[in-house]
Every structure is written in C-alpha cells, then in structure tokens.
C-alpha cells in the first residue's frame, strides 16, 4: 500500500504508466494449509481492484500477475517460523502439481505493459483454477480440498 501511494507522483508524471502488483493464485482460489498467505494475497487483489478505479483518472493502469507455484526460494522453506513446519515445501508441491519456472513470471511482468487485463493468472494450472473459480467455485473448493487434504491443521 505504501509503495503504491509513494510511487503515485512518479506514475502521474509518466506517460502510459502501469502499476503492477504481484499477487498469487492463492489470492484467487482457496489454499488450504496456508490460509494467512492466501488472505494477504486476497488483500493484494482487493487493493489492485480499488487502485485501478482510483488511479484511472490519472491515466495509470493498475493490474496484477497471479503466479501458480513458482520455482523460487519460498518453496525451499522447511520452516514457517521457529515452531511451525511449512506444509508447502517443494517436495510436497511437486507431488501434487507442476511448478512453473521463474522465467514465466518475468515474462508476465514484461508483457503486462501491453496486457489490459486486471488479473493475470499464469500457466495452464493458474488459468484453469482462476477460470473455474469464477465459473464454478464449488468445483475448485472441492478439488483444492482433495488435492491438499493433508495440509489441514489437526
């Protein structure tokens, strides 16, 4: 939030400005086992929606990219904190779905300048999940529950 507002002056004075937020598919579809992470990404989605309307009067386009699981250091984490193990490490994710290369995110950032959509899910899985979450949310909740059933807290 602070970064977006801090950059507003610069964006207002730059022709064809684009403010791009990095969200996550976890902000569009349920992510059991990482509820707080999903909630923060859902907040980024809400911020993006609101800023898109607010900044439109300055001719600043606001959008976001929504990566699927991406091969970054976050998947290497075995611990979320000193006393909590990460339920979503690379091995866990690899057993359930495809992990996208980081280059896919870099390309999406580059392409976002000409892409006019507000939400930009990446990869086949991300686009599939996002599409069906809008079309049939109960299906995605069912699939998410089955796919990640062993991440629920006991």
Label each region the model flagged.
Residues 31-35:
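Active-site loop immediately N-terminal to the catalytic Tyr-X3-Lys motif
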Residues 57-124:
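SDR active-site lid
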Residues 4, 40:
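Active-site helix of classical SDR
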Residues 27-29:
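Conserved catalytic-site region of short-chain dehydrogenase/reductase
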Residues 24:
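Residue(s) in the substrate-gating loop at a strand-loop-helix junction
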Residues 9, 53-56:
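Alpha-helical segment proximal to the catalytic Tyr-Lys
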Residues 116-151:
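A transmembrane-helix-recognition feature enriched in membrane-embedded lipid enzymes
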Residues 37, 45:
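Catalytic tyrosine of NAD(P)H-dependent dehydrogenase/reductases that use a Tyr as the general acid/base
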